[in-house]
A protein has these predicted regions:
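Extended boundary segments
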Residues: 1-16, 78-81
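Short alpha-helix capping/helix-loop boundary micro-motifs
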Residues: 32-36, 53
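A generic structural motif
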Residues: 16, 27, 52-54
Length: 81
């Protein structure tokens, strides 16, 4: 997927463990999901790191806090790539 600047965007689901990237957009299907991600600190320009992958969840850090999110939430986080 390319954004208006011609840069490639991908979701957090495609990021391997141990990678830090920058959020370029939150693209959620509903406002509850979007608001939840915002409450975690997921905003455009923020750095986000994938710490590990579990069977159904991804462990991330953002703003020095660690969270476990599912693949639906991860697919709503578009990162540089």
């Amino acid at each position: 997927m390319k954004n208006n600047d011609g840069l490639k965007e991908r979701t957090l689901n495609s990021v391997p463990e141990g990678t830090t990237c920058t959020i370029v957009k939150i693209q959620a299907d509903d406002t509850d999901m979007e608001n939840f991600l915002f409450s975690l600190g997921c905003f455009e320009g923020e750095e986000i790191s994938v710490i590990s992958r579990l069977e159904q969840n991804i462990i991330i850090t953002i703003k020095e806090a660690r969270y476990s999110i599912d693949s639906d939430l991860a697919s709503a986080i578009l990162i540089d790539g």
